[in-house]
Each structure stands twice: as C-alpha cells, then as structure tokens.
Amino acid sequence: MIQGEERQFKKGQIILKEKSFELAIYNVLLGRAGVYVNYGTPEERLVVEIEAGDFLNVISFLESRPRNTTAVALEPTVVRVITHDNFSTFFRDNSAKIMSLLEHMSARMRALQRAYI
C-alpha cells in the first residue's frame, strides 16, 4: 500500500504553483492536470497534460528546489502526496511504480525542452 495523504481538486483549481516549494511527489490517482509555465500571464504555455497514473512535482522533489511549473486540474482530480518521509517506503514497496516514475520523468524533461525551444 502506498502511504500518503489524498487530496482532491475541482476543475480549474491549482494543484501546484510555480516557484512554490514542497518536498513531495504527487501521484495522480484520478483525473487530469495541465502543467503550465508562466500560468496566468500572457506568456502562459501548456507544457504537458498529466493523467491518472502519472506524477507531478518530480523534478522539484529530486532537486529540492522550487517548482518550475504550475499544475491545474483539467477535471476533478485526486492525487496521493508522497512525502520525503514516506518515499523510501514507496520505493521499497512499489518497484513497478518506480519504473513508471522514471518514464514519467523522461517524458516530462522532453516536454519541458520542447516548451523552451
């Protein structure tokens, strides 16, 4: 069982905000989220859409740095918050999820590269 708090978001609600910081990864359990750079500005740009099974805030978590994107619920969305404290348990008990996490990271980095090029 993956430990962590579940959070629910309504369509249009901000899940994660650019430049904020939280040492946690969000596993999307239900719904979809849009990941944006410069959200709410004239330079706003959708980088990628995240669906159930995907992750949010991975790069910020691994680098212990503020977020470089904003995630917004595109429909009602539920996430599980995997904190630094329970990440080791997550890694040990969910080896298949770790491969999914790595695949997500790779796809996300590719999407961010396209957004900035």
Regions found by a protein language model. Give the residues of each.
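Regulatory nucleotide-sensing modules
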Residues: 1-36
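A residue-level structural signature of the nucleotidyltransferase/glycosyltransferase Rossmann-like core
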Residues: 6-7, 47, 79
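Short aromatic/basic micro-patch
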Residues: 25, 49, 81
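ATP/adenylate-binding site constellation spanning eukaryotic-like Ser/Thr protein kinases
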Residues: 30, 52-55, 76, 84
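Short beta-strand His + acidic residue motifs that chelate non-heme Fe in jelly-roll/DSBH
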Residues: 35-36, 58, 69-73, 89
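Short acidic-glycine-tyrosine-enriched beta hairpin
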Residues: 40-56
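Ligand-binding loop in jelly-roll beta-barrel domains
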Residues: 62-85
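A small-molecule sensor/coupling module
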Residues: 67, 87-117
